Amino acid sequence: GMQHKYRETVLFFPTPGQTCHSYCTYCFRWAQFVGDQDLKFAARESDQLVRYLRRHREVSDVLITGGDPLVMKTRVLRRYVEPLLAPGLDAVTSIRLGTKAPAFWPHRFVTDDDADDLLRLFEEGLDAGKHLALMAHYSHPRELTTPAAEVALQRIQDAGATVRCQAPLIRHVNDDADAWADMWNTQIRLGAVPYLHVRGARHGTEALLRGAAGSRPATSRFRP
């Protein structure tokens, strides 16, 4: 249920968050969904994580991921986030949530019955001195332009969280410079941060040179 990925970064996979709003064919975490318990990362409680972090004070960054942790109700998510806010874990300065909820279900932050409690949890992280970020997956600019999506991003940021955006290159979806330039500029306009291209799955990938050729004109039109 836990992976010490880099010197400063630990990935944590809470069991209730090992599903998604939808399943992406390009996902490199396919092992979470195929029913093979020997391959799957999953942790029912956060006690093991807290003990590990107390022993490894070089870790400053915890990424809660899956699956998608925001399929969990806020009361369940709290069981995994609140222990990271407690005294004694001052070395942990960054808490990140890997999620596609802002694109697939922006109402999670707006009209869901526990949306306000979710935003209060973000505020509590800020009050505890943590940098809290949503690692949001957007694959096309249209995912950013619905009224619910725009309100969700505003509410997340008003609660003190940062939104960093990532996406893979997908054929017939965003494999041209216009899509990327539009997406990056829309993210900036809405206060989010274009962050990275996701890499990992080999099936269905675009040719590397094609992707690079498309990124250069998109970058030239990016207005940070």
Residue ranges with predicted function:
Residues 11-13, 63-66:
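Short glycine-rich or small-residue beta-strand-to-loop segments that form or flank ligand, phosphate
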Residues 40-44:
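Chitinase-like catalytic core of GlcNAc-active glycosidases
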Residues 11-16, 48-51:
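Short, charged beta->alpha transition segments
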Residues 47-54, 61, 70-222:
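Conserved AdoMet/S-adenosylmethionine-binding subsite of the radical SAM
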Residues 29-39:
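Iron-sulfur (Fe-S) cluster-binding segments and ferredoxin-like electron-carrier domains
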Residues 1-12:
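N-terminal [4Fe-4S]-dependent radical SAM core
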Residues 14-15, 19-31:
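Local cysteine-cluster metal-coordination motifs and their immediate loop/turn environment
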